[in-house]
A protein has these predicted regions:
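Carbohydrate-active catalytic/glycan-binding domains of CAZyme proteins
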Residues: 2-496
């Protein structure tokens, strides 16, 4: 490498800005950040820099949207030395993907602003259906701290969201919940008729009754998804603790939940093993309003502590996407690589080939899942869509739309498995800031293929003519020379 950078300038045909491009391999590389909390060779966690937990998900127009408790809001309130007590969390994080490894961060739903009556907002569960108006309606249920359940609605998975009730849907001490001290952690599903069902519950049972608490409840929702069409019915979930979720398949309701931290000394069944400590348990029923119909299928997802990682609480969601079945969950992956030890969680995804009758025991992994298909660079992509990054954060553009923003010199983002096909010689980007963005391929320390010079306070569209045609599949890095450079969007232009 030489100390000097020689480059040619190509006039931007859109707005007159210049793209600075390397020539004769004589470039000066910026110092690349090592502050990467998600490794470049592991697909977990989902977000490389946002603490979030208790995942749920829904598919819309071929894209998977997931939502979770915004642990990062707590982290920002208490800092590295603080503990995650969840008391400052009043929002829900949103991310999405169409390949299961590159995830776009969409910001958060400001629950406190939409529903100012809340105490906190944790552990969402979402479903959607096409209704009589021909539109898809989304219903997002969430824990109002440990004292109830609220619900938001929208006509798009990113909102805008509204609070149709203006109050909790479920609250402590409402009739029928005498044996449910903490009616939170909702799990929602739809049956084949589009009827909604909701499970929930939590709280500590008497010490003498940890095995059969009957604390969790299930209820059939009204046609509006905002009321009830049955009594609250108990589910006899062994060693129940929290984290209810519901799925429906082939006429069978699948109820999953987190077991507690208690000893299993009083387990008295021989047909199925006792579930592990704070593992996920599973029950099924074809007639969910009959308490006797629920059958315990066993523990199916180990605690992270039994998977060679730090112990933490447990919350999962089963989901099928593009013909493959996954389990969404959380661990402490990011925390393990940072200064904090306060219990700040991160959402993850692993394979779980479940059916309505079989639930293979699996565990959390660092490796995660594989890319379902290469990323298409000839479609516009948000700068906030990535596999991992270092020293990056976000700037909101509009509801559900973010730009990625550098926090320091040498910050970078990494997009995995980008298929340029027969080739491109031009990129179109929308960016702002003072400095340069470098385009690198396959290695964050590689020499830049293109260097885009920025000197603008507002977002500008920039056409970047590359000195070398890019063909085939590559991992793409955008490196940032200084703080406060924002990349909103990028796209390759197909070579004719």
């Amino acid at each position: 490498m030489t100390e000097k950078m020689q480059a040619r300038r190509v006039q931007n045909p859109i707005n007159g800005l210049c793209a600075v491009l390397p020539k004769n391999n004589e470039v000066m590389l910026m110092k690349i950040s090592e502050n990467c909390y998600k490794l470049e060779n592991t697909a977990n966690p989902i977000s490389p820099n946002v603490f979030c937990a208790d995942p749920t998900g829904v598919e819309y127009n071929g894209r998977l949207y997931i939502y979770g408790t915004n642990d990062h809001q707590e982290y920002e309130a208490v800092g590295d030395d603080g503990k995650n007590d969840y008391v400052h969390i009043k929002s829900i994080v949103m991310l999405s993907t169409d390949d299961m490894v590159n995830w776009e961060y969409h910001g958060f739903i400001d629950i406190a602003k939409i529903a100012p009556w809340i105490v906190n907002s944790w552990a969402p569960s979402i479903t959607s259906r096409v209704e009589a108006d021909g539109k898809t309606h989304f219903y997002l249920y969430f824990s109002n701290s440990g004292c109830g359940v609220g619900v938001l609605t929208a006509e798009h998975p990113l909102g805008p969201w509204s609070d149709p009730l203006g109050k909790p849907l479920i609250y402590q001490n409402m009739p029928g919940l005498e044996n449910c001290p903490a009616p939170f952690d909702p799990g929602v599903c739809l049956d084949e008729n589009g009827t909604g069902w909701l499970a929930f519950g939590g709280g500590t049972p008497p010490a003498s009754n940890t095995l059969h608490t009957n604390i969790p409840k299930i209820v059939r929702l009204g046609k509006d998804m905002l009321s009830f069409d049955s009594d609250f019915v108990p589910i006899d979930a062994p060693y129940f603790f929290e984290a209810s979720e519901l799925n429906y398949e082939n006429g069978t309701f699948i109820y999953t939940y987190s077991t507690d931290w208690q000893s299993r000394e009083n387990w008295n069944r021989t047909d199925v093993p006792a579930p592990g400590i704070c593992s996920m348990g599973c029950m099924t029923s074809k007639t969910p309003l009959d308490p006797e119909s629920w059958q315990f299928k066993g523990g199916f997802f180990l605690n992270a502590g039994d998977s060679g990682m730090d112990w933490c609480n447990n919350h999962t969601h089963l989901i099928e996407y593009k013909g493959t079945r996954y389990i969404l969950h959380h661990t402490l992956h990011i925390q393990e690589r940072t200064k904090t030890k306060g219990g700040f969680r991160c959402m993850c995804v692993d394979l779980l080939p479940y059916t309505d009758t079989e639930f293979p025991v699996t565990k959390a992994t660092r490796e995660g899942v594989t890319q379902t298909q290469p990323l298409d660079p000839y479609k516009a992509h948000s700068g906030a869509e990535m596999f991992t990054c270092a020293d990056m954060w976000y700037e909101q553009i509009s509801t559900g739309k973010m730009a990625v923003k550098s926090l320091a010199e040498g910050a970078w983002t990494y997009i995995k498995g980008v298929d340029f096909g027969k080739g491109t010689e031009k990129l179109l980007i929308t960016a702002k800031g003072m400095g340069v963005i470098e385009l690198r391929l396959d290695d964050r320390n590689a020499e830049p293929l293109g260097v885009i010079e920025l000197a603008n306070d507002g977002f500008d569209k920039i056409s970047v003519v590359l000195p070398t045609k890019i063909t085939g599949i590559h991992n793409v890095y955008f490196a940032f020379s200084s703080k406060d450079i924002c990349l909103e969007r990028w796209q390759a232009e197909r070579k004719e």
